[in-house]
Amino acid sequence: MTFSKQLFLYLFFLFPLLHASHPQQCSSSSCGRDDVHVRFPFWLLSKQPELCGHAGFNLQCTASPKTALKLPNSGTFLVREIDYLSQQIRLYDPENCLARKLLTFDISRSPFSALYLVSYTFLSCPNEVAKSSRFDSIPCLGNSTTSFLATTSLDLAKSMLPSCQIVKTLDVPVSRRVIAKKSRFSTDVNDKDLWLKWDSPSCSDCERDFLRCGFRSNTSLQVKCFPFENSGYNTEPQVLKIILLSIIGPLTIFATCIAVGVCTSERFASLIQRNVAIAALQPNEVIVTTGLDESIIESYKKTELGESRRLPGNNDDIVCPICLSEYASKETVRCIPECDHCFHSECIDVWLKIHGSCPLCRNSPSPARQAV
């Protein structure tokens, strides 16, 4: 074999190896051109792999298209802004009636918490009373006979009794502390955005250093900082990549010119045909990630925790790895066969319906075990 043929074949097999040594990173995505940018710990359900985000941080695109977050027990909200450095997310109601969702708002089963809480008292009043009091009502909650009012002053709310009835007093997540206004009712509770924060996973250090945050490995829920491929920082892998490309580039041009002559020979044509035949016998492996049927999930063992809150088997965790909440007595946990990892039953049920694998070790139970 001549030197030119050896050089061509060397480069032919070298390029796939170089590409394999630098796997594609999880790049940011968005639902629309002017919409929020989505990156770790968030991930878009229809546009990014599940390994690009953390459990509980999955977003989805609406038909608008807008970015939406579905909170357990609280409904779906649209995302107006994500501050990755401060680890805050700003939400608003797509139906422009935030007050209605606040009456049943609950984020205890999500990874989010409030920046600040302001106590609001909601009242229902006959329309005649509301109009005569000259207080602003919340339009989207009222009807032909009843109006709804909201105030940060409990004393003001009590002064409306017995003509009005207190519906509920609740804490509303806001972006800053608010001083209660004792002299008036307000409709701004319906106009405000919800401000939530997350403490885990902690990626603020990565954002501060202009690095991307991600899982340490495919089998770990721990996170670390990685350099962006296009961040412009002079990291060692990037320098090595530039050196390799500066050497391979001229060699590629030289090998291409020689390959034009080589391709005319029957021997080279035979080599190509043989490689194609071998490749045809080796189909690419396709990995499809699907969730499990509810019947299979229900077959996995459930256990009610006692006063010791000790998990079955050799598990010594004190918090659920999915929702990051501590286990409590009388709570129900479900354990995955084979790996024996345990979680809150309501958390792992939702996870397995989407992913079909353990969120800790990423192993899927074998068909034989699922049928048990």
From Swiss-Prot:
Its main location: membrane. Pfam families: GUB_WAK_bind, zf-RING_2. One of its GO terms (cellular component) is membrane. The chain crosses the membrane at residues 242-262. Residues 1-20 form the signal peptide. It is a single-pass membrane protein. Pathway: Protein modification; protein ubiquitination. Its EC number is 2.3.2.27. It catalyses: S-ubiquitinyl-[E2 ubiquitin-conjugating enzyme]-L-cysteine + [acceptor protein]-L-lysine = [E2 ubiquitin-conjugating enzyme]-L-cysteine + N(6)-ubiquitinyl-[acceptor protein]-L-lysine. It comes from the Eukaryota. SMART domains: RING (SM00184). The keyword Metal-binding applies. Keywords: Membrane, Metal-binding, Signal, Transferase, Transmembrane, Transmembrane helix, Ubl conjugation pathway, Zinc, Zinc-finger. It is found in: Membrane. Coiled coil: none annotated. GO terms for biological process: protein ubiquitination. PROSITE patterns: ZF_RING_2 (PS50089). GO terms for molecular function: polysaccharide binding; transferase activity; zinc ion binding. A zinc finger (RING-type) spans 320-362. Belongs to the RING-type zinc finger family. ATL subfamily. The RING-type zinc finger domain mediates binding to an E2 ubiquitin-conjugating enzyme. This is Putative RING-H2 finger protein ATL21A. It comes from Arabidopsis thaliana. The lineage of its organism: Eukaryota, Viridiplantae, Streptophyta, Embryophyta, Tracheophyta. The gene is ATL21A.
